[in-house]
């Protein structure tokens, strides 16, 4: 099973809590995180894109770096780990993304890929005057289909004459082209999102579900597997989890309860309000899960809380689910979390037993 880190491009990572570590996103922080991840044989690093935060006492995600420029910098200071940036496709023409991706492919030596997002949070785009109207909620995957077709043209042949409802290319050129086939990833959980991933993505991200229920996402992975079978492609699921670990189950649980007790209710209310604005995409979207009050303090990603041995066991359970090819991990404290994962959790995981011995620790 592949292991990736979801780097904290926004302030405070993924805990919407006054009791969680409070920090700003910086290049130096993310460089330290990704270099540690590479040292511990993580397979990939991904950054999201967020253009407006949730506010509240913690100013959650009000402070964000930009994904492509951050990952270009991280590509230059790593040598093995795969690097993914996220394109907010309403903000960037596909020909520009194609050229930026080819540039980072050159920087990284063929280790770069692109995560495509359609955009669901209206205020991110309304503030710039580029929200296309609420009809976009029901047409966003039509838009993304044209977008990726332009990308594939430009990466494949260096030229596109694509004509569609959203994009018109007229002898559009991009050169140099990527040195290896460019990987495209997506994070669709709606039927439309999974159908898109089945046709165009190399793999699809999905949310884990619940606290210490590592296989609860299995129906989502099964839906993705079924959608991919319809297209004759192999598109695996990569599952998002937060790891909160300590020496004992009780110590880890105490951390989790402490974070929940400090939930930033103002920021969470804003998230709930935004999640209700898309009335056209169905009830199975990522944002619906994010705003569920059950565990909104970490946007309801799957949460693994326990001793190092318990977390290792639960991750092995994740690996046993058909269609689950990897996990994307966040941590309550990224630097110490990756270190304890690499030193104390990963060595106990049967699904990572193939890894080579560690070299000297990264500075």
From Swiss-Prot:
- What InterPro entries does this protein map onto? Luciferase-like_dom, Luciferase-like_sf, Pyrimidine_monooxygenase_RutA, SsuD_RutA_monooxygenase
Q: Name one GO molecular function term.
A: alkanesulfonate monooxygenase activity
* Expression induction or repression: Up-regulated by the nitrogen regulatory protein C (NtrC also called GlnG) and repressed by RutR.
**Biological process (GO), any one:** nitrogen utilization
The answer on whether this UniProt entry bears the keyword Flavoprotein reads yes
Residues engaged in binding FMN: 49-50, 115, 124, 140-141, 190
Q: Which reaction does it catalyse?
A: uracil + FMNH2 + NADH + O2 = (Z)-3-ureidoacrylate + FMN + NAD(+) + H2O + H(+); thymine + FMNH2 + NADH + O2 = (Z)-2-methylureidoacrylate + FMN + NAD(+) + H2O + H(+)
Gene3D superfamilies (UniProt xref): Luciferase-like domain (3.20.20.30)
Task: Recite the UniProt keywords alphabetically.
Answer: Flavoprotein, FMN, Monooxygenase, NADP, Oxidoreductase
Which EC number(s) are documented for this chain?
1.14.99.46
Under which main EC class is this enzyme filed?
A: oxidoreductase
Give the UniProt family note: Belongs to the NtaA/SnaA/DszA monooxygenase family. RutA subfamily.
What function does the entry list?
Answer: The FMN-N(5)-oxide reacts spontaneously with NADH to produce FMN. Requires the flavin reductase RutF to regenerate FMN in vivo.
Q: What is the name attached to this protein's record? A: Pyrimidine monooxygenase RutA
């Amino acid at each position: 099973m592949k292991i990736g880190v979801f780097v904290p491009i926004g302030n405070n990572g993924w805990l919407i809590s006054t009791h969680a570590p409070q920090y700003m996103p910086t290049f130096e922080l993310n460089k330290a995180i990704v270099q540690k991840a590479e040292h511990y044989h993580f397979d990939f690093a991904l950054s999201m894109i967020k253009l407006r935060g949730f506010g509240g006492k913690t100013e959650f995600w009000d402070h964000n770096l930009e994904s492509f420029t951050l990952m270009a910098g991280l590509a230059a200071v790593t040598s093995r780990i795969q690097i993914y940036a996220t394109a907010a496709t309403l903000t960037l023409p596909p020909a520009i993304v194609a050229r930026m991706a080819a540039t980072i492919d050159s920087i990284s030596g063929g280790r770069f890929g692109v995560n495509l997002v359609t955009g669901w949070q209206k205020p991110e785009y309304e503030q710039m005057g580029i929200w296309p109207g609420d009809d976009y909620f029901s047409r966003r995957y039509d838009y993304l289909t044209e977008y990726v077709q332009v990308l594939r043209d430009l990466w494949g042949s260096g030229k596109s004459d694509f004509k569609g409802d959203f994009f018109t290319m007229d002898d559009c050129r991009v050169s140099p082209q990527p040195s290896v086939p460019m990987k495209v990833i997506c994070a669709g959980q709606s039927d439309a999102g999974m159908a898109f991933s089945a046709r165009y993505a190399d793999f699809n991200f999905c949310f884990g579900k619940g606290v210490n229920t590592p296989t609860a996402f299995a129906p989502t992975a099964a839906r993705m597997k079924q959608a991919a079978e319809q297209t004759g492609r192999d598109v695996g699921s990569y599952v998002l989890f937060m790891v909160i670990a300590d020496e004992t189950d009780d110590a880890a649980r105490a951390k989790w309860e402490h974070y929940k007790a400090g939930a930033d209710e103002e920021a969470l209310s804003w998230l709930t309000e935004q999640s209700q604005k898309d009335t056209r995409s169905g009830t199975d979207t990522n944002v619906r899960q994010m705003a569920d009050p059950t565990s909104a303090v970490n946007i309801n990603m799957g949460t693994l809380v326990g001793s190092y041995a318990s977390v290792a066991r639960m991750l092995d359970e994740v690996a046993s689910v058909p269609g689950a090819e990897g996990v994307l991990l966040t941590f309550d404290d990224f630097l110490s979390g990756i270190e304890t994962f690499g030193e104390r959790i990963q060595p106990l995981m049967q699904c990572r037993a193939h890894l080579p011995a560690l070299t000297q620790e990264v500075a």
